[in-house]
A protein has these predicted regions:
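Small-residue (primarily alanine) positions within well-ordered alpha-helices
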Residues: 9, 13-16, 26, 52, ...
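Helix-adjacent hinge/juxtasegments
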Residues: 49-50, 54-87, 91
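Zinc-dependent deaminase
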Residues: 1-19, 80-83, 87-147
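Active-site phosphate/pyrophosphate-handling residues
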Residues: 4, 33, 55
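A glycine-/small-polar-enriched, mobile loop at the entrance of the PLP active site in fold-type I
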Residues: 43-47
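Residues that line or immediately flank small-molecule/substrate-binding pockets and catalytic motifs
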Residues: 42, 76, 100
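Short beta-strand scaffold segments in enzyme catalytic cores
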Residues: 24-32
């Protein structure tokens, strides 16, 4: 199941690039169905907070009741950055599944921004289940082609 949903996130990441944005996509999953999807919109919306996970959490928080969020899983093409980790925490989404590890992307970009999700949530005392990487090489191909 994880593979299929991560592949959908990779399709969203490719769509984000086609729309002129950065290669990231995310979806919300519960009870065997995709509740909603989001892409990165940083470039087209001129908004540095327009990460796929933030866009997803922002929309989900407005449209779904808290009980739905509490029982959902967030799938994302790449491990969430620290900003997105915080949004997921505050939305009370208990599970994250990611494709590409943040450390792999940071290494590709030569960046030092990476904070592991598991480490962040442990420091917060949050019981958010983190699974990943899943199909990482497929996701890295998207990033290599972009960055």
């Amino acid at each position: 199941m994880h593979d299929e949903l991560i592949k959908r996130c990779y399709a969203l990441a490719r769509s984000a690039v086609a729309h002129g944005n950065h290669p990231f996509g995310a979806l919300l999953w519960k009870d065997g169905q995709i509740l909603m999807e989001a892409e990165n919109t940083v470039v087209t919306q001129l908004d540095v907070t327009g990460h796929a996970e933030i866009n997803l959490v922002r929309t989900a928080s407005k449209r779904l009741d808290p009980e739905t969020l509490i029982g959902a899983s967030l799938y994302t093409s790449t491990e969430p950055c620290i900003m997105c980790q915080g949004a997921i925490y505050w939305a009370a989404i208990p599970r994250i599944v990611y494709g590409v590890a943040g450390s792999s992307l940071a290494e590709l970009q030569g960046a030092a921004w990476y904070t592991p999700s598991r480490e962040s949530y442990q420091r917060m005392g949050a019981s958010i289940e983190v699974t990943g990487p899943v199909l990482e090489e497929e996701g890295m191909e998207i990033h290599r082609g972009f960055w």
